[in-house]
Amino acid sequence: MKPASTRLLAINAVSKVFHDGACETQVLHEVNLTVHRGEQLAIVGSSGSGKSTLLHIMGTLESPTSGTVLLEGENLHQLSSKRQAQIRNQDLGFIYQFHHLLPEFSALENVAMPAFIQGKNKAQTLAEAKALLERVGLGHRLTHLPSQLSGGERQRVAIARALINKPKLVLADEPTGNLDAVSGEAVYGLIRELAEQLGTAFVVVTHDANLAARMDRQVNMKDGILSQSETHR
């Protein structure tokens, strides 16, 4: 068991119920999970198992019906909307199945955008964005628009964007789901490499057990219930 000092995110008895008129559907059942600093964690489950909902709650994009989510001891869902937005921009990074890049901006500008929103120095931010794109193998594609990039290249830009503010935790929802096998493997390799080099924790939601097995640890979700974790290394 890892010491408490390495704990980054603690999810305690989190449940989620969706209401539709008189009907209610419980998608999470008292989930408990700890994410450690620099850890690479996979959440595996079939579609509709609740794994994406859990990821959204971890990122303050949705609120739990009950339970708590603590980031370095701070209860995320007791904070103001403004403070939650600050945490999403400063401490969390997000990667989705679809890259959500801004089509009118270059790869370099897309990566820099979260730092611009935070009001960071433009020249320094662009230099850091360039360095990140070089790190993900796209130093030669800085001025290209998303429409001029392949699917794998767009997702690499999205990964660089997620890291621009040096987050403590990156949340990735099916980041390879829209890619071919070769590109998907490259993206997972990049996630592992960056986690190890930068000390950033990654939580990756996926239905692909083979890819999840390459992470430090995986947990399995079925019908909103999280199973015991499996450590790989």
UniProtKB/Swiss-Prot annotation:
<feature type="domain" description="ABC transporter">
    <location>
        <begin position="9"/>
        <end position="233"/>
    </location>
</feature>
<dbReference type="InterPro" id="IPR011924">
    <property type="entry name" value="LolD_lipo_ATP-bd"/>
</dbReference>
<dbReference type="GO" id="GO:0022857">
    <property type="term" value="F:transmembrane transporter activity"/>
</dbReference>
<dbReference type="GO" id="GO:0005886">
    <property type="term" value="C:plasma membrane"/>
</dbReference>
<dbReference type="GO" id="GO:0005524">
    <property type="term" value="F:ATP binding"/>
</dbReference>
<dbReference type="GO" id="GO:0016887">
    <property type="term" value="F:ATP hydrolysis activity"/>
</dbReference>
<dbReference type="InterPro" id="IPR015854">
    <property type="entry name" value="ABC_transpr_LolD-like"/>
</dbReference>
<keyword id="KW-0997">Cell inner membrane</keyword>
<keyword id="KW-1003">Cell membrane</keyword>
<dbReference type="InterPro" id="IPR003593">
    <property type="entry name" value="AAA+_ATPase"/>
</dbReference>
<keyword id="KW-0813">Transport</keyword>
<feature type="binding site">
    <location>
        <begin position="45"/>
        <end position="52"/>
    </location>
    <ligand>
        <name>ATP</name>
    </ligand>
</feature>
<protein>
    <recommendedName>
        <fullName>Lipoprotein-releasing system ATP-binding protein LolD</fullName>
        <ecNumber>7.6.2.-</ecNumber>
    </recommendedName>
</protein>
<keyword id="KW-1278">Translocase</keyword>
<keyword id="KW-0067">ATP-binding</keyword>
<keyword id="KW-0472">Membrane</keyword>
<dbReference type="GO" id="GO:0089705">
    <property type="term" value="P:protein localization to outer membrane"/>
</dbReference>
<comment type="subunit">
    <text>The complex is composed of two ATP-binding proteins (LolD) and two transmembrane proteins (LolC and LolE).</text>
</comment>
<dbReference type="Pfam" id="PF00005">
    <property type="entry name" value="ABC_tran"/>
</dbReference>
<dbReference type="InterPro" id="IPR027417">
    <property type="entry name" value="P-loop_NTPase"/>
</dbReference>
<dbReference type="InterPro" id="IPR017871">
    <property type="entry name" value="ABC_transporter-like_CS"/>
</dbReference>
<keyword id="KW-0547">Nucleotide-binding</keyword>
<dbReference type="GO" id="GO:0044874">
    <property type="term" value="P:lipoprotein localization to outer membrane"/>
</dbReference>
<comment type="function">
    <text>Part of the ABC transporter complex LolCDE involved in the translocation of mature outer membrane-directed lipoproteins, from the inner membrane to the periplasmic chaperone, LolA. Responsible for the formation of the LolA-lipoprotein complex in an ATP-dependent manner.</text>
</comment>
<dbReference type="InterPro" id="IPR003439">
    <property type="entry name" value="ABC_transporter-like_ATP-bd"/>
</dbReference>
<dbReference type="InterPro" id="IPR017911">
    <property type="entry name" value="MacB-like_ATP-bd"/>
</dbReference>
<comment type="similarity">
    <text>Belongs to the ABC transporter superfamily. Lipoprotein translocase (TC 3.A.1.125) family.</text>
</comment>
